[in-house]
Amino acid sequence: MKPVKLFYQERCPFCKKALRYSEELKEEHPEFQPIEIEMIEETQHPDIADQYDYYYVPTFYVDGVKVHEAGIFKNEMEALLRKVIE
């Protein structure tokens, strides 16, 4: 399983939606349940966030590669989680 990093902001509505989709998909698809997402709140950890190339949140990195940046739909979140378990 590939490592996943999520850069987010606590008050970001798009970030909350992405997390909700992630939880829903884990309930709907048992193969996603073991996936762990390292969550990095960029305002609390600017030193880490500054090491990555992105502008908008939420931003997902899978295995060190940026795979999604900005708002996300549920079907996009499912595709992202599938990349993790490939």
PLM-predicted stretches and their roles:
Residues 32-46:
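Thiol-based oxidoreductase modules, predominantly thioredoxin-like and allied folds used
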Residues 1-28:
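Local sequence-structure signature of Cys/Sec-based thiol-disulfide redox active-site neighborhoods
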Residues 10, 52-53, 82-86:
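A general structural signal for short secondary-structure boundary/capping elements
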Residues 61-86:
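Non-catalytic, surface beta->alpha helical segment in thiol-disulfide oxidoreductase systems
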Residues 51-61:
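Structural micro-motif
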Residues 19-22, 29-31, 65, 76-78:
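Non-catalytic interaction surface on structured domains
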Residues 16-20, 51-52, 72:
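Generic recognition of short, well-ordered alpha-helical segments
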